C-alpha cells in the first residue's frame, strides 16, 4: 500500500514538473506582451486564428496565447494570473481536472484555456451549476474575451430558440449543465434544421465538475409530455390507506431505503380495498400505487428529500447541494404519491419523449475538462468513465487553516447543545462562523436553538437560496453567524472582513459527516482561502445517519470500552476519524458501483439514441429527395412480410401476403392471390415491390413541386420515428425494471437488458419501416395539407396522415388476437398493430 501511495505521489510530482516548465515559458512572454499597445494585443486574436488555419496546433500556440490572456486580464480586470493558475489552465486545455483549493481563482484560471480553444472557431461551452454563476462569470470574464475580440453568449432557460441559437453561435457560451442537456434533447425533436440551436459539441469546461459529473451522474435529463390520466383518485385512496398503517404493518430496509407491506399490512390492504388476494395479476396497478404511497409516507421526508413551495408545489431537494431542483419530478408516480401525501394538487403523469444522463451527455464532447477543489477522492471514476486525470495544483500560499479532530457525542441532542455552546463562545469574541448541515431540517433546528440562545444569524438552504450570494459574501464579516446546507455558496468566495484574521479567521463547524468525504472537504474549504487563517471542527453523534447505517462494529466496541454513561460525554480520538473515513469510503464505493451500473444500462440506450439521432439529423438536414431511403424501407418491409410466412402452409402464406399487401401497400384491385400462386418468394417480393413503386410515384405526383415532396417525406419519416422512439424509451424503462428482478435468478440483469434491448431496437426499426411504408402508400394527400405540412416546426403529424393512420388500423382484416400480425413483424397481432384495437 505504501509503495502504491509513493508511486501516486511521484507521478503527481512528475506531472507538476512538466506543468511548471510550460508555465515558465508562458511567463517568459510577459514583458513582450506588456510592451504591446492595446490595439496590438487585441490583434493577437486574429493572428492566432490565421496561424491555426495555416496548420499550427493549439498546443504550439498555448504559451503565447496564455500570455496574451494574462496581460488582457491585467489591463481589463486588474488581475494577473499566478504561475499555479497557469498550470491549472494547462491541465484544463489537456482535457483533465486541476484540483484547485477554494479561493485559488479557478474562474480566472479558466480564461486561458477557454480563449485558446475558442481560437479554433468551433465553440467553447463553460458549464456552471446555476444561472447566477453563468451570468456572473459571463459578465466578469466576458469583458476579457470581448476586449480580445471574441463573442460571448449566455444560454438561459428563459431564452427563446432564436436567442439560444445566437448564444450557441458565439465563440464562448456560458450555460448550466441541465440547459445544455435539454437543448441537446430538444434539438433532436425538431423537424426543421433552422429550429435547432446547438452546434456540434466541441469543448466543455465544467465548473464544480465533481458536482455535475459525479453527484448528478445518475440523474437523467428527461423531456416528457403529459399523459391524460384519471388516476388521481387512486393516488389519494392509496395514500389514505397507508396512513391507517402502524409500524408493524410495513418493513423498511434502512441501508437501501426500500419498504414493503408486512403480512398484517397485506391483510389490511385486502380488507381496505375489498380484495381476496392483493397480489393477483389484475391488482398489479394497485400494488404499484400502494408501494409509492408507502415510500412517500415513510421513506421520503419533508424538508430533507423535498420541500413544499409557497404555491403548493413539491420541489425535490438535491442531497448533495441542498438546492431545490426546479422542474425536476420523481419518476414512476412517486412525485404524485408525495403530492397526495402533502394534500397539494396532483399533477398529471408524463411520458418520456427523450432522455439522457449527464454521464453520456458530456462524453459526447470532443474534449471535456473541469475544475473543482475536491476531486482526488473520485479519481478512479473520473479516469474510468470520462478518461480524465485529476492533477492536484499547489496553492499560491501555504494553507493556514487548522482542522481539529472530530468530536463524538452519544446523542443528537447533546451534540447540538455542544454546537450551540461553541457558536456562542466564538461569537462572543467576534469570530465569523459557518455552520454546515446535511439537511434543511437540521439547519432549521439549529436556527431555532440559536434564536433561543439570542445569537443573530443567517440561514442558507433550499428554501431561500435566491439570497445565496449575498449571504455568503457577508459570512466572513466580524460577528457573522451563517447556517448553510451543503450548497454553502459553492462558486462564491467568503472573504474575511476587517480584523477577522486576528480572531483566527472563519470557523467552519460541521454538524455531521456526509456520506462523501468530498462534500466534507468542500465545507472545510470554505475557510482558509489564499493562505487566510481559519478553523474547521466536525461534531458527530451515534445517532447520525452515517453512523447508524454504516458505523462499524469496531466503533461500537470502542465506544463500549469508553463507557459513555453521561449524555454530554465527548470523545476525541484519531481512531474515530479513521473509522468514519472508512465508513465513508464504503458508501462512496457503493455509490460508484451504482453509478457504474447506471452507465452500463444507459450505454444500451446511448448506442440506440445515437443511431436514431444521427439518422434523424440526416433527414432534417437533407436537401435532397429522400425517395431512395423510403423505397429501401418499402423493400425491407415487403421482404419481412413475405419471409414471416415462408414456413406456413403455401395457401395460407399466399392469403396472408395478399392481406398484408391490400391493407398496407396497394389498393385491393392491384393484387390477388391468383397471380401470386406458383411464384417463388423472391418473385413475390419483386412483384409486390414493383406494384408498391407504382403507388409511390402516384402519391408523389399529387404534390405540387420537388420542395413539397421533400417536406412531405421529412415530416412523414420524422413523425413515425419520434412516435416509435418515444414508445421504445418507455418499453426500455419497463424492461429495465423487469430484468432487475432476474438478478435473484442468478442471471446478469445488465447482459439480459443488453440482449433484449437490442432485439427490441431491431423490432422498433422494423415497425418504423412498416409504418412509413403503410402511411406513404395510404395517405390521402391534399393541396392544403401540403402547405400546412411545410409550416410544421414540431414532430406533430399533418392531420390527414394521422387520421389516415388511424383509419388504416381500423381497416385491418379480421385477424385473431394470437395470429401473426400481417405486417410481417413476426409478433402476434395483439402485441403489434392490433394492440390499439384491443386496448
UniProtKB/Swiss-Prot annotation:
Subunit comment: Monomer and homodimer. Part of the essential Sec protein translocation apparatus which comprises SecA, SecYEG and auxiliary proteins SecDF. Other proteins may also be involved.
Function in brief: Part of the Sec protein translocase complex. Interacts with the SecYEG preprotein conducting channel. Has a central role in coupling the hydrolysis of ATP to the transfer of proteins into and across the cell membrane, serving as an ATP-driven molecular motor driving the stepwise translocation of polypeptide chains across the membrane.
Biased composition (Basic and acidic residues): 780-790
This protein's record includes keyword Secreted: no
Protein name: Protein translocase subunit SecA
Keywords, comma-separated and alphabetical: ATP-binding, Cell membrane, Cytoplasm, Membrane, Metal-binding, Nucleotide-binding, Protein transport, Translocase, Translocation, Transport, Zinc
InterPro entries xref list: Helicase_ATP-bd (IPR014001), Helicase_C-like (IPR001650), P-loop_NTPase (IPR027417), SEC_C_motif (IPR004027), SecA (IPR000185), SecA_CS (IPR020937), SecA_DEAD (IPR011115), SecA_motor_DEAD (IPR014018)
Membrane disposition: Peripheral membrane protein
UniProt region (Disordered), positions on chain: 780-839
Enzyme class per UniProt: translocase
Listed GO MF terms: ATP binding; metal ion binding; protein-exporting ATPase activity
SUPFAM superfamilies listed in its UniProt record: Helical scaffold and wing domains of SecA, P-loop containing nucleoside triphosphate hydrolases, Pre-protein crosslinking domain of SecA
Subcellular location: Cell membrane; Cytoplasm
Amino acid at each position: 500500500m505504501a509503495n502504491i501511495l509513493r508511486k501516486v505521489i511521484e507521478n503527481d510530482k512528475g506531472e507538476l514538473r512538466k506543468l511548471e516548465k510550460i508555465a515558465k515559458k508562458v511567463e517568459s512572454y510577459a514583458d513582450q506582451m506588456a510592451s504591446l499597445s492595446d490595439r496590438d494585443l487585441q490583434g493577437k486574436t486574429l493572428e492566432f486564428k490565421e496561424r491555426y488555419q495555416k496548420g499550427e496546433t493549439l498546443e504550439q500556440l498555448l504559451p503565447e496565447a496564455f500570455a496574451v490572456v494574462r496581460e488582457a486580464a491585467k489591463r481589463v480586470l486588474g488581475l494577473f494570473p499566478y504561475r499555479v493558475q497557469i498550470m491549472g489552465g494547462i491541465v484544463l486545455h489537456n482535457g483533465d481536472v486541476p484540483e484547485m483549493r477554494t479561493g485559488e481563482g479557478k474562474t480566472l484560471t479558466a480564461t486561458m484555456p477557454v480563449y485558446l480553444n475558442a481560437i479554433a472557431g468551433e465553440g467553447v461551452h463553460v458549464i456552471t451549476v446555476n444561472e447566477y454563476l453563468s451570468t456572473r462569470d459571463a459578465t466578469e470574464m466576458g469583458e476579457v474575451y470581448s476586449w480580445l475580440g471574441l463573442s460571448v453568449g449566455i444560454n438561459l432557460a428563459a431564452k427563446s430558440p432564436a436567442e439560444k441559437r445566437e448564444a450557441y453561435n458565439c465563440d464562448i457560451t456560458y450555460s448550466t449543465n441541465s440547459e445544455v442537456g435539454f437543448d441537446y434533447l430538444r434539438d433532436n425533436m425538431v423537424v426543421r434544421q433552422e429550429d435547432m440551436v446547438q452546434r456540434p459539441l466541441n469543448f466543455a469546461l465544467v465548473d464544480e465538475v465533481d458536482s455535475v459529473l459525479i453527484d448528478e451522474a445518475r440523474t437523467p435529463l428527461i423531456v416528457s409530455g403529459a399523459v391524460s390520466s384519471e388516476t388521481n383518485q387512486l393516488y389519494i385512496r392509496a395514500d389514505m390507506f397507508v396512513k391507517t398503517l402502524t409500524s408493524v404493518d410495513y418493513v423498511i430496509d434502512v441501508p437501501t431505503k426500500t419498504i414493503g407491506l408486512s403480512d398484517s399490512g397485506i391483510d389490511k390492504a385486502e380488507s381496505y380495498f375489498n380484495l381476496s388476494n392483493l397480489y393477483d395479476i389484475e391488482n398489479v396497478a394497485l400494488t404499484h400505487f400502494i408501494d409509492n404511497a408507502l415510500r412517500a409516507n415513510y421513506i421520503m421526508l419533508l424538508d430533507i428529500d423535498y420541500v413544499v413551495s409557497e404555491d403548493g408545489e413539491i420541489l425535490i431537494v438535491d442531497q448533495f447541494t441542498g438546492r431545490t431542483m426546479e422542474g425536476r419530478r420523481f419518476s414512476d408516480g412517486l412525485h404524485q404519491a408525495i403530492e397526495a401525501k402533502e394534500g397539494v394538487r396532483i399533477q398529471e403523469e408524463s411520458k418520456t419523449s427523450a432522455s439522457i444522463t449527464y454521464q453520456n451527455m458530456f462524453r459526447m464532447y470532443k474534449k471535456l475538462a473541469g475544475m473543482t477543489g475536491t476531486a482526488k477522492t473520485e479519481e478512479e471514476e473520473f479516469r474510468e468513465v470520462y478518461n480524465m486525470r485529476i492533477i492536484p495544483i499547489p496553492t499560491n500560499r501555504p494553507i493556514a487553516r487548522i482542522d481539529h479532530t472530530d468530536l463524538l457525542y452519544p446523542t443528537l441532542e447533546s451534540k447540538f447543545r455542544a454546537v450551540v455552546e461553541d457558536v456562542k463562545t466564538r461569537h462572543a469574541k467576534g469570530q465569523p462562523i459557518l455552520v454546515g448541515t446535511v439537511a434543511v431540517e437540521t439547519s432549521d433546528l439549529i436556527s431555532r436553538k440559536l434564536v433561543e440562545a439570542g445569537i443573530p444569524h443567517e440561514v442558507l438552504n433550499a428554501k431561500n437560496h435566491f439570497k445565496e450570494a449575498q449571504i455568503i459574501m457577508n459570512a466572513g464579516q466580524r460577528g457573522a453567524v451563517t447556517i448553510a446546507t451543503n450548497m454553502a455558496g459553492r462558486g462564491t468566495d467568503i472573504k474575511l472582513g476587517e480584523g477577522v484574521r486576528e480572531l483566527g479567521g472563519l470557523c467552519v463547524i460541521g454538524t455531521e459527516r456526509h456520506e462523501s468525504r468530498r462534500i466534507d472537504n468542500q465545507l472545510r474549504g470554505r475557510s482558509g482561502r489564499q493562505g487566510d487563517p481559519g478553523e474547521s471542527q466536525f461534531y458527530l453523534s451515534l445517532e447520525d445517519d452515517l453512523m447508524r447505517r454504516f458505523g462499524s462494529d469496531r466503533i461500537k466496541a470502542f465506544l463500549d470500552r469508553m463507557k459513555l454513561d453521561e449524555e454530554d460525554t465527548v470523545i476525541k480520538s484519531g481512531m474515530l476519524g479513521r473509522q468514519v473515513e472508512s465508513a465513508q469510503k464504503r458508501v462512496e464505493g457503493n455509490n460508484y458501483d451504482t453509478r457504474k451500473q447506471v452507465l452500463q444500462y444507459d450505454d444500451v440506450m446511448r448506442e440506440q439514441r445515437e443511431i436514431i439521432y444521427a439518422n434523424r439529423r440526416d433527414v432534417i438536414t437533407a436537401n435532397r429527395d429522400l425517395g431512395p431511403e423510403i423505397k429501401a424501407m418499402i423493400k425491407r418491409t415487403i421482404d419481412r412480410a413475405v419471409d414471416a410466412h415462408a414456413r406456413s402452409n403455401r395457401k395460407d402464406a399466399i392469403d396472408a401476403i395478399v392481406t398484408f399487401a391490400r391493407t398496407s401497400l396497394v389498393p385491393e384491385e392491384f393484387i390477388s392471390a391468383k397471380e401470386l400462386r406458383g411464384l417463388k418468394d423472391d418473385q413475390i417480393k419483386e412483384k409486390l415491390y414493383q406494384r408498391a413503386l407504382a403507388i409511390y410515384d402516384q402519391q408523389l405526383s399529387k404534390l405540387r413541386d420537388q420542395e413539397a415532396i421533400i417536406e412531405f417525406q421529412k415530416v412523414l419519416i420524422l413523425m413515425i420515428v419520434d412516435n416509435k422512439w418515444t414508445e421504445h424509451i418507455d418499453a426500455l424503462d419497463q424492461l429495465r425494471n423487469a430484468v432487475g428482478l432476474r438478478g435473484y435468478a442468478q442471471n446478469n440483469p445488465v447482459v439480459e437488458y443488453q440482449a433484449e434491448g437490442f432485439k427490441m431496437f431491431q423490432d422498433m426499426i422494423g415497425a418504423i419501416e412498416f409504418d412509413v411504408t403503410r402511411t406513404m402508400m395510404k395517405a390521402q394527400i391534399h393541396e392544403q395539407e401540403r402547405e400546412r405540412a411545410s409550416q410544421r416546426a414540431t414532430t406533430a403529424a399533418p392531420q390527414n396522415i394521422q387520421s389516415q393512420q388511424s383509419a388504416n388500423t381500423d381497416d385491418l382484416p379480421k385477424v385473431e388476437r394470437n395470429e401473426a400480425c400481417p405486417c410481417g413483424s413476426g409478433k402476434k397481432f395483439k402485441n403489434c398493430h392490433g394492440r390499439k384495437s384491443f386496448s
